[in-house]
Amino acid sequence: MSTTPATPKVGFVSLGCPKALVDSERILTQLRMEGYEVVPTYEDADVVVVNTCGFIDSAKAESLEVIGEAIKENGKVIVTGCMGVEEGSIRDVHPSVLSVTGPQQYEQVVNAVHEVVPPRQDHNPLIDLVPPQGVKLTPRHYAYLKISEGCNHSCSFCIIPSMRGKLVSRPVGEVLSEAERLVKAGVKEILVISQDTSAYGVDVKYKTDFWNGRPVKTRMLELCEALSSLGAWVRLHYVYPYPNVDDVIPLMAAGKILPYLDIPFQHASPKVLKSMKRPAFEDRTLARIKNWREQCPELVIRSTFIVGFPGETEEDFQYLLDWLTEAQLDRVGCFQYSPVEGAPANDLGLEEVPDDIKQERWDRFMAHQQAISTARLQLRIGKEIEVLIDEVEEQGSVGRSFFDAPEIDGNVFIDGDHGFKPGDKVRCRVVDADEYDMWAEPI
């Protein structure tokens, strides 16, 4: 009497940024193509894969905690991701992990799964089809599109280049074909991500590739122009403030891509920026922001900043607050500086900022920026916006406008039952707003 072999089951935990999420999607897509079932609990899995984050100490602590939970609940754990470059640190705490690999090592992770629980030999990929767009961990109506790996910068607070390597741009034809598959599968919003989006193509000297028989340069401008032809929202993230950012503003003004720029400025004080090894042209940056908004009045700028960097004085911090007042950024995140093992900032010999002062400056920063964000959203009241519906709840619908990237920005709330479903795009009028969110009514 023959029995059908059990379907191999994998548990998966993805930690960290959207770039890591895309790595997880690639691994899961390959496993699904080989017939593995992805299960939501540790208990039901034959093996658990943990995709870690290693950017800052708190992220490493979370990664180690999750690995420990998986070992306790399942016992068979494979570790990958950014913290995987510190295999010794992981094995010191969790010596029983089965394997440890760094980021982007998709094949090694899949092979490690094979060693624990081999794929079924009778699996027929033509019966259990994986969708053309692959396995996605985001809702069906939006997706992250990773255009490159690594980074050529050497910011003193960052260890990303040591974890993910130098810039390696994906062929633009491959990127555009993936985007096309996503849109055909129902994706309404494409979020372009990388470590350094504006450097796309630098490593290959902006070589010309082909998409649907059409020549396209491997460069941010040409990529955006091509993406705009697909009919989805296109949102740019992790844009380093190179001069070529100016080139995409006309596309935003023309409505071809969303008028939204995610630019991590990190600070404004020339002295602190120099210590960070970031561009220290804060006055020129203000002029550029002014010029961008003259060309595209609807432009939304999101940024992130670090307070309490070694050597930051009260004068430096006040300079940052004054700069924020001038810049009038729309969406802003802020982190208190946390030393990262292996980061060049540890060896600068600068005076550490005490934790209580870091906290006090963070509180002041957030209060200062909240007032700016509130005032800018108040300007939207009475205006028409297009809203992409993310969720439908009992009280109404929750969506986002071009102002809002998923997870990190605000929401648009629409009260009442209007028959909407996730992925719908709805014309609305803004009726109220606070420092982060807007309330709107369908038109």
From Swiss-Prot:
Q: What PROSITE patterns does this protein's entry cite?
A: MTTASE_N, MTTASE_RADICAL, RADICAL_SAM, TRAM
Q: Where is the TRAM domain?
A: 378-443
- Protein name stated in the entry: Ribosomal protein uS12 methylthiotransferase RimO
* Binding residues for [4Fe-4S] cluster 1: C17, C53, C82
Q: Which family does it belong to?
A: Belongs to the methylthiotransferase family. RimO subfamily.
NCBIfam families named among the record's database cross-references: 30S ribosomal protein S12 methylthiotransferase RimO, MiaB/RimO family radical SAM methylthiotransferase
A GO BP term here is: tRNA modification
The note on cofactor binding and number reads: Binds 2 [4Fe-4S] clusters. One cluster is coordinated with 3 cysteines and an exchangeable S-adenosyl-L-methionine.
Instruction: List the catalysed reactions.
Output: L-aspartate(89)-[ribosomal protein uS12]-hydrogen + (sulfur carrier)-SH + AH2 + 2 S-adenosyl-L-methionine = 3-methylsulfanyl-L-aspartate(89)-[ribosomal protein uS12]-hydrogen + (sulfur carrier)-H + 5'-deoxyadenosine + L-methionine + A + S-adenosyl-L-homocysteine + 2 H(+)
Residues that bind [4Fe-4S] cluster 2: C151, C155, C158
Q: What cofactor does this chain's UniProt record say it requires?
A: [4Fe-4S] cluster
Q: Which organism is it from?
A: Pseudomonas putida (strain GB-1)
